[in-house]
């Protein structure tokens, strides 16, 4: 267990270390404080909490196929099944690289009420915000999305500097992806079974079969 925790710390550090110097340090960092309590990372969901069928999406914010799913399939899925209360849709972030983790930190920074709106903007603007090889440019691009969502720079800088939360996010991702046998993105858990990327018609057939049971 101790070895696993050390590995998680190293992975989170590797993904966040490049943020040092890219966002201003917060005042909280200069003082001493008691050890923080364990950080619980929750999954965000849309749709009825009473729905009998849950669809879980695993996606990376830097994955082109994930962006395509959100542009081409997700709107119809949302209109037909999520907004109507037929299913509960849960989004789980996947961190293959530092940019994907940083995007998730910005999305979560807005809280539950803003989360999915920020997710939509991150995917819609993926080719723009993630195109640069300069990490500072990527951070500024993500903060621009955050500003559009109503966040100020001080709030976002504090979120981006939260290494303990980044570590907890990575641990949450690894635990879920291992439990579900994740192989790539986007992937979907429907009725407890993991599926790879698919068309709307393919997803509709799987969901309808679950609803009919």
Where do the PLM segments sit?
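Glycine-rich, flexible loop/turn motifs
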Residues: 42, 102, 156
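C-terminal cap of thioredoxin/glutaredoxin-like
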Residues: 2-12, 28, 60, 144-213
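Structural alpha/beta surface segment adjacent to cysteine/selenocysteine redox centers
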Residues: 61, 67-147
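A short alpha-helix capping/helix-coil boundary motif
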Residues: 56-58, 120-123, 151-154
């Amino acid at each position: 267990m101790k070895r696993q925790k050390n590995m998680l710390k190293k992975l989170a550090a590797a993904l966040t270390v490049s943020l040092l110097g890219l966002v201003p340090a917060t005042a909280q960092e200069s003082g001493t404080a008691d050890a923080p309590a364990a950080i619980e990372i929750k999954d965000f969901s849309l749709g009825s909490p009473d729905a009998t069928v849950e669809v879980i999406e695993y996606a990376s914010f830097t994955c082109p196929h994930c962006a395509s799913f959100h542009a081409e399939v997700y709107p119809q899925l949302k209109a037909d099944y999520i907004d109507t209360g037929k299913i509960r849709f849960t989004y789980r972030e996947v961190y293959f690289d530092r940019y994907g983790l940083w995007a998730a930190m910005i999305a979560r920074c807005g809280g539950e009420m803003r989360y999915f709106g920020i997710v939509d903007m991150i995917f819609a603007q993926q080719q723009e915000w993630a195109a640069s090889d300069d990490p500072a440019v990527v951070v500024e691009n993500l903060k621009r999305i955050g500003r559009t969502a109503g966040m100020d720079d001080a709030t976002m800088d504090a979120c981006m500097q939260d290494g303990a939360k980044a570590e907890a996010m990575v641990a949450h991702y690894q635990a879920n992806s291992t439990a579900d046998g994740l192989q790539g993105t986007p992937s979907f858990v429907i009725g407890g079974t993991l599926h790879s990327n698919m068309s709307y018609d393919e997803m509709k057939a799987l969901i309808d079969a679950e609803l009919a049971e």
